[in-house]
Amino acid sequence: MRTRTLIPFGAAIGLLASASAVVVSQARTPYLLVLNKDDATLALVDLKTNAVAGRVGTGEGPHEITVSSDGAMAFVGNYGGQTPGSTISVIDLAARKEIRRVDLGALRRPHGLAFADGKLYFTAEVNRAVARYDPATGQIDWLLGTGQATTHMILVNKDASRMFTANIGGDSVSVIERGASPLAWNVTVVPVGKGPEGIDISPDGKEVWTAHSRDGGVSIIDVAARKVTQTIDLQTKRSNRLKFTPDGKLVLISDVDTGDVVVVDVAGRREAKRVHVGKSPEGILIAPDGGRAYVAVSGDNNVAIIDLKTLAIAGRISTGIDPDGMAYVER
């Protein structure tokens, strides 16, 4: 025979209220993290309201930012100004404060950043190198030279077994792959166009695209073959960043000199549209749901919001002076 336990009405209401409280407590707020180079600050933008919810000071000339896998910490490369920078700011996002400024010693101009497998990978432009910082020990525990001038941006896969760097001065992309042991690495230098800077990997992991800042082209690299299979002439004046949409259908490229974001149809390998966003667009971040792109318009001191369905500007956010690098986090 089945037995049933009857819960008094008042207790049932209490249980429902408790369940609702749990749901509310688990609700997370999306934030856009924006670096303001001239202000030397990180602005935290609440994307529910598009208002700046807080600011944190960084080192001089913060250019790029990434976030730990758990969303607790942000890491900022302090590129410097006339004097090359040599520090990385570690920021507690809950407390909204810098908790450590990592001294990189002889490594200069930290730039591209990526967090993978519990560690921070970054480029050191002056040193033509990629290095790794372990937050658990507070130490730089790995360093690899690329042999290429101005190693600028970096992409790293989830287990940190493969990475790609855009080498502006070397007119190349370095494909860096772990060998038979964690200490063995293989580097393939892939020649591309003039001044590769913006770089991203397709969502399916099969292609790396890099935009040339000095000849208006985009090189498409077959990851498996480690070679360029196609070059698209987009006639950009000075491309800066390149990002895929999450569905892999579009690529967005910022053109600093024209003030445009060039939208590329990936399947057709052709320009689909140009969206004029303002003076000197630089960093690009695309929301994980693929609905919007955020473009740091450094010359106008704002972040333009592009609706990726209509490919029209949907708003602007004032974050500080000379915005550039951005990251996304939910807390």
Question: What is each model feature region?
Answer:
Residues 4, 10-331:
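Predominantly soluble domains enriched in secretory-pathway, periplasmic, or organellar proteins
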